């Protein structure tokens, strides 16, 4: 009798994806983030589902319904803070996952990489709409400022913004549709993640050396299933520490003030994971230019396969590229810091320098350094 694991139409798919999957034997902990992202997505969908049972998407009652969840629902405070901080953990894992892909040259798997970038956009859209739902001050003004950016699109901008708002300002119609999209997008993200995995399994995983590893592969289970489980436990430890001890560490105090269209907060800023892009947006004095730079700051990831000039796939044996990769990481930290600062000297100048450096490293320095390293190989 043959093993049901290998013959059953459904179980066979699971088997080829998570059990008998041939995996390079030398993949490091940097390869844990895919499974951690899956885990984060499950946490977000489950907690989100329970929050949706008690939340009302009406401007009059949205803020009160969140208060009700925290005060009156059994473990509502836990569900709410797990959902809010789960988004932060999601983005931490996402940034590390993308960074790993850039460092080790995983972007040469074109389909996997491009679907990954689409996934990043989808998660960012979901997080933005989720931030609007509690209907606090930062929710309202964040939604107003970010959606208003679309008015920079020539000819059709204003019409487009009013169409998204469902009126002449962010109001009940906007909140209702944002709730609807915020509810449905995670399921689309889950479907995209499956496609992402499907394309990855067509080629097999990359590994730290960037070399072909067909001659040295081991089954995913039990080796990497145990390794992933350790990653999940470490993530849970950090996550629950955040949720149970400092749940408001990454949030904005202004969001505990109910939305008031007549009172603008002194500093309007998005959640921390959007600050780098927000800093790039603000560093350009022109509105349309800022919006283009904002979109391109993420879309630039799709150019990496084209900009790859090196004869080696990974940066493991390329010290000069490594140096500039870490300068790029430091630059992203700088942009994140600047995005949370008021628009005044010296922050404006620092933001502009950091924005120029971001695009220069990616578009000019890294490809040039790669060509230099190719020359040094022959030397």
Curated annotation (Swiss-Prot):
Segments crossing the lipid bilayer: 33-53, 77-98, 113-133, 178-198, 226-246, 288-308, 320-340, 347-367
Cellular component GO terms held in the UniProt record: mitochondrial inner membrane; respiratory chain complex III
Record: residues binding a ubiquinone: 201
Cofactor(s) required for function per UniProt: heme b
Locations listed in the record: Mitochondrion inner membrane
Gene Ontology biological process terms, A to Z: mitochondrial electron transport, ubiquinol to cytochrome c
Cofactor note: Binds 2 heme b groups non-covalently.
Keyword list, A-Z: Electron transport, Heme, Iron, Membrane, Metal-binding, Mitochondrion, Mitochondrion inner membrane, Respiratory chain, Transmembrane, Transmembrane helix, Transport, Ubiquinone
SUPFAM superfamilies per UniProt: a domain/subunit of cytochrome bc1 complex (Ubiquinol-cytochrome c reductase), Transmembrane di-heme cytochromes
Chain residues that bind heme b b562: 83, 182
Predominant location category: mitochondrion
InterPro entries on file: Cyt_b/b6_C, Cyt_b/b6_C_sf, Cyt_b/b6_N, Cytb/b6-like_sf, Cytochrome_b, Cytochrome_b_C_euk/bac, Cytochrome_b_N_euk/bac, Di-haem_cyt_TM
Pfam families named among the record's database cross-references: Cytochrom_B_C, Cytochrome_B
GO molecular function, one term: ubiquinol-cytochrome-c reductase activity
Residues annotated to bind heme b b566: 97, 196
Gene3D superfamilies xrefs: Cytochrome Bc1 Complex, Chain C
Membrane protein topology class: Multi-pass membrane protein
Complexes and interactors: The cytochrome bc1 complex contains 11 subunits: 3 respiratory subunits (MT-CYB, CYC1 and UQCRFS1), 2 core proteins (UQCRC1 and UQCRC2) and 6 low-molecular weight proteins (UQCRH/QCR6, UQCRB/QCR7, UQCRQ/QCR8, UQCR10/QCR9, UQCR11/QCR10 and a cleavage product of UQCRFS1). This cytochrome bc1 complex then forms a dimer.
Other comments on record: Heme 1 (or BL or b562) is low-potential and absorbs at about 562 nm, and heme 2 (or BH or b566) is high-potential and absorbs at about 566 nm.
Family to which this protein belongs: Belongs to the cytochrome b family.
Function summary: Component of the ubiquinol-cytochrome c reductase complex (complex III or cytochrome b-c1 complex) that is part of the mitochondrial respiratory chain. The b-c1 complex mediates electron transfer from ubiquinol to cytochrome c. Contributes to the generation of a proton gradient across the mitochondrial membrane that is then used for ATP synthesis.
Record-given protein name: Cytochrome b
Record organism: Hylopetes spadiceus (Red-cheeked flying squirrel)
Protein encoded by which gene: MT-CYB
């Amino acid at each position: 009798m043959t093993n049901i694991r290998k013959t059953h139409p459904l179980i066979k798919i699971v088997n080829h994806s998570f059990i008998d999957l041939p995996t390079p034997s030398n993949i490091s902990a940097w390869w844990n983030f895919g499974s951690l992202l899956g885990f984060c997505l499950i946490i977000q969908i489950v907690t989100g589902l329970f929050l949706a049972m008690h939340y009302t998407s009406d401007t009059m009652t949205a803020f009160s319904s969140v208060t009700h969840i925290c005060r009156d629902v059994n473990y509502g405070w836990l569900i709410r803070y797990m959902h809010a901080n789960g988004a932060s953990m999601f983005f931490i894992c996402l940034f590390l996952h993308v960074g790993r892909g850039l460092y080790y040259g995983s972007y040469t798997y074109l389909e996997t990489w491009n679907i990954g970038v689409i996934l990043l956009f989808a998660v960012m859209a979901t997080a933005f709409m989720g931030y609007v739902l509690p209907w606090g001050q930062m929710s309202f003004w964040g939604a107003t400022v970010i959606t208003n950016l679309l008015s920079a699109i020539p000819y059709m901008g204003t019409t487009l913004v009013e169409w998204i708002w469902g009126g002449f300002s962010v109001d009940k119609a906007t909140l209702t549709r944002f709730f609807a999209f915020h509810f449905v997008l995670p399921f689309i993200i889950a479907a995209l993640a499956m496609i992402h995995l499907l394309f990855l399994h067509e080629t097999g995983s990359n590994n730290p050396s960037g070399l072909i590893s067909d001659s040295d592969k081991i089954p995913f289970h039990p080796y990497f299933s145990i390794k992933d489980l350790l990653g999940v436990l470490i993530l849970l430890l950090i996550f629950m520490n955040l949720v149970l001890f400092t749940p408001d560490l990454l949030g904005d105090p202004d969001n505990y003030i109910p939305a008031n269209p007549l009172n603008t907060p002194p500093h309007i800023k998005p959640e921390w994971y959007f600050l780098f892009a927000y800093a790039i947006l603000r560093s350009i004095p022109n509105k349309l230019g800022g919006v283009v730079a904002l979109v391109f700051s993420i879309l630039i990831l799709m150019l990496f396969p084209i900009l790859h000039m090196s004869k080696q796939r990974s940066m493991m044996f390329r010290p000069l590229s490594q140096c500039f990769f870490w300068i790029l990481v430091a630059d992203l930290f700088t942009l994140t810091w600047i995005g949370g600062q008021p628009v005044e000297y010296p922050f404006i100048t620092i933001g502009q320098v950091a924005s120029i450096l971001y695009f220069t490293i990616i578009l000019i320095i890294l490809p040039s350094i790669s060509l230099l390293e190719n020359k040094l190989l022959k030397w």
